[in-house]
């Protein structure tokens, strides 16, 4: 039986974001603020404006459209601006009451309305300034060969016909819309990572995926700010600016599976082609006294592997069992019913206990199980909580760019654990790194940056603050968006709103 030599050569530690890099990064942002179509998720309609996709101002409530009694707006100005898009939709919603169409149906219907508007009136608003809708990649052949996707198309086609009635387009034409929108649309999130809507932006759709992205998408409602995560990258340049289509904090096997299931390509980015990415799926050495990771992956041919550090042989059966166990673990934990929610903590503990026996502590599955358990229960059984957070942080550094907000959030978990142990000097550099990351990700005027700046200042200046006061600064409750509008105004890039008249009242 062949024996694989396990090479475990650690990469040289990348420095975190330096202050002299930040101004360089800010100078090369790219802003998109004319989407082709947007839609708030149905469960979020009462929380976010149907026009700007922002939440209401503090102390304010959304105003409901008096025509359809469904769409809601943060102001009369937003409702008036949206009328050009909402007018044809409004009467359909009223006619379909009390049957509410799926979010996807409402979204694709808006895409159809936009296409028809452009055909009739031309592109007066610059919606197709970045590229034409007709130029979008559609993967029609792949979608036709995908039985599950085609079954979904038939379902959506039927529901769209019921919603649009006599205004429904021919099936082949709708298939073209369905394919282009499926491949090129993106989700809209708050800064806390909560999904609130979906959008098709022709400019954003130009950017390719990388599991080692060089830019992040930051949202201000439907507006997108593309911010470089590394110095030297210009967000305008699609040859060097890459975004992530998926959650990149996972193994190569899971990333490629998800990318292929929706976008129909096998990712060969620099990270997916890097053998060291297998550190994310490392297993334990057979020698209990050895802490070296044994590199493998879920899909690698099982074989005996020799530990590079202690030379112990990890048997093929052990390797295969670990690979199979990783494949059985859920990619995410999203319980749907009260019984599942109640059972989740126990299930997570059981899965984690087995994972820790066979998988290395640096394994991404272990990190995700620990993170899920921490979020569900607020506690972990490990004696040294800061050590656990440091392990997850080291794992995140293998998954995310050094200026990614996920890394910043994990740094704050370390800061919190150290503060609670009264190790404030040790917490201070982690707070500083988190502050620099949030400056890159969110900007100088965002609450996340300002809050972390205050935390670092208190620690660095040794200002007398209670543990409770410092810990409070590690918890983010403000979900305010990045103020991209102010950036546009400063750059004189904000266009006037389209002409709107004859809007119905708001309640």
Swiss-Prot record:
The protein's Enzyme Commission number: 2.1.1.357
MF-aspect GO terms: histone H3K36 methyltransferase activity; zinc ion binding
Gene Ontology cellular component annotations, sorted alphabetically: endoplasmic reticulum; nucleus; sarcomere; striated muscle dense body
Keyword Metal-binding among record annotations: yes
Chain ranges of zinc fingers (MYND-type): 49-90
PROSITE patterns for the chain: ZF_MYND_1 (PS01360), ZF_MYND_2 (PS50865)
Top-level taxon of the source organism: Eukaryota
Keyword line: Metal-binding, Transferase, Zinc, Zinc-finger
Record-listed Zn(2+) 2 binding positions: 65, 68, 86, 90
SUPFAM superfamilies found in the cross-reference section: HIT/MYND zinc finger-like, SET domain
Loss of function: phenotype: RNAi-mediated knockdown causes lifespan extension.
Tissue specificity field: Expressed in pharyngeal and body wall muscles.
Family: Belongs to the class V-like SAM-binding methyltransferase superfamily. Histone-lysine methyltransferase family.
Function: Histone methyltransferase. Specifically methylates 'Lys-36' of histone H3, inducing di-methylation. Plays a role in modulating lifespan and oxidative stress resistance, in a manner dependent upon daf-16/Forkhead box protein O and the Insulin/IGF-1-like signaling (IIS) mediated pathway. Represses transcription of daf-16 isoform a, perhaps by methylating histone H3 at the daf-16 promoter, which in turn leads to recruitment of histone deacetylases and thus modulation of expression.
UniProt xrefs under PANTHER family: HISTONE-LYSINE N-METHYLTRANSFERASE SET-18, HISTONE-LYSINE N-METHYLTRANSFERASE SMYD
The protein's name in its UniProt record: Histone-lysine N-methyltransferase set-18
Organism of this sequence: Caenorhabditis elegans
């Amino acid at each position: 039986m062949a024996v694989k030599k396990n090479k475990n050569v650690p990469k040289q530690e990348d420095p975190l974001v330096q202050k002299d890099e930040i101004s360089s990064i800010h100078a090369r942002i790219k802003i998109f603020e004319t989407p082709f179509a947007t839609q708030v998720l149905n469960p979020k309609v009462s929380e976010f404006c149907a026009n700007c996709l922002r939440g209401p101002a503090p102390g304010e409530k959304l105003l409901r459209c008096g025509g359809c009694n469904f769409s809601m707006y943060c102001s009369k100005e937003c409702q008036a601006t949206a009328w050009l898009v909402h007018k044809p939709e409004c009467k359909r919603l009223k006619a379909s009451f009390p049957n509410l169409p799926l979010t996807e149906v409402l979204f694709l219907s808006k895409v159809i309305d936009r296409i028809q508007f452009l055909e009739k009136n031309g592109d007066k608003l610059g919606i197709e300034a970045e590229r034409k809708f007709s130029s979008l990649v559609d993967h029609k052949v792949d979608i036709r060969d995908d039985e599950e996707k085609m079954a979904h198309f038939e379902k959506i086609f039927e529901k769209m016909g019921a919603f649009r009635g006599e205004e429904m387009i021919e099936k082949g034409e709708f298939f073209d819309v369905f394919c282009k929108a499926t491949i090129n649309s993106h989700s809209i999130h708050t800064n806390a990572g909560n999904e609130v809507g979906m959008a098709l932006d022709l400019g954003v759709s130009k950017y390719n995926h990388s599991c080692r992205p060089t830019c992040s998408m930051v949202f201000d409602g439907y507006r997108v700010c593309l911010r470089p995560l590394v110095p030297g990258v210009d967000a305008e340049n699609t040859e060097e600016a890459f975004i992530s289509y998926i959650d990149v904090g996972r193994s190569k096997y899971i990333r490629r599976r998800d990318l292929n299931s929706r976008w129909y390509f096998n990712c060969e980015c620099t990270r997916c082609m890097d053998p060291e990415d297998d550190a994310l799926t490392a297993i334990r050495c057979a020698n209990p006294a050895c802490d070296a990771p044994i590199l493998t992956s879920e899909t690698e041919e099982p074989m005996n592997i020799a530990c590079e550090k202690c030379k112990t042989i990890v048997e093929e059966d052990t390797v295969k069992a670990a690979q199979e166990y990783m494949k059985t673990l859920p990619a995410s934990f999203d319980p749907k019913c009260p019984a599942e929610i109640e059972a989740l903590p126990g299930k997570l503990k059981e899965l984690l206990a087995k994972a820790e026996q066979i998988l290395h502590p640096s394994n991404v599955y272990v990190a995700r199980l620990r993170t899920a358990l921490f979020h569900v229960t607020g506690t972990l059984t490990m004696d040294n909580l800061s050590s656990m957070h440091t392990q997850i942080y080291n794992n995140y550094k293998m998954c995310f760019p050094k200026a990614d907000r996920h890394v910043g959030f994990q740094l704050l978990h370390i800061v919190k654990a150290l503060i609670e142990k009264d190790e404030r000097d040790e917490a201070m550099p982690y707070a500083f790194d988190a502050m620099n990351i949030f400056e890159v990700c969110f900007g100088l005027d965002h609450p996340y940056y300002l809050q972390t700046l205050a935390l670092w200042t208190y620690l660095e200046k040794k200002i007398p603050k209670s543990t409770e006061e410092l810990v409070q600064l590690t918890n983010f409750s403000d979900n305010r968006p990045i103020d991209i509008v102010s950036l546009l105004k400063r750059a004189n890039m904000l266009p006037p709103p389209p002409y709107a008249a004859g809007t119905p009242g708001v309640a």
